[in-house]
Curated annotation (Swiss-Prot):
It comes from Mus musculus (Mouse). InterPro entries: PLAC1_fam (IPR033222). Belongs to the PLAC1 family. Keywords: Secreted, Signal. This is Oocyte-secreted protein 1.
Amino acid sequence: MKPFVGLLGLLLLLSFMKTCADDWTAISLQCADHWFHLRIRPTIFHNIFMEPDEVFLGIGCPVTTTWPNDTYEFIYRTYSCGIANKVLCDVTLLKTQLTYISKNASLQAEMSLSCVMHNQSPHFCEAESRGDFTGDPPGWTEDMRARRDEQTVPMVQPNLSTSSEDHHVSTEPWASETSRSEAAEVPSFMDQNFSVFHFSRM
């Protein structure tokens, strides 16, 4: 009986490792030259297939490009979409979140994202700001051009719920700001709180 239980545990462990590998290859995050570049698969959340108009970066920034191979892309300036910027001497820490809001059900999922940029010429030892500037900061030049065939979806401002959990699925109806229900966690390895970290040079 014990060998059977041990074999079953090994199979469950291998299945868990495969699920982790599948989901972690479903995300690519880069930040450089004051650009935040994120690519995801619509299956990044366990047992959920997201449509491009159901997933948002930060405070409601929609997918900027949908690729034929089922890849969603977000390309935004690091001071937009409510992305938090924390400058510490020679590095800048960017923090935001990815939010899924179902159109057909009261289902919501969130994932925290972080990215570290190394500053070539640091001017501040500690400063913190949150995005939503209306124009380029002084001295910042636009060095990235949008593709000609890229179609930018109009900005959508969904009602996002706040939570201390880094990653969870909520059954809260997002159409109402006052009605709140208790969050139900994702039944997978992604139950654990985590942040996606990426280190990049400017």
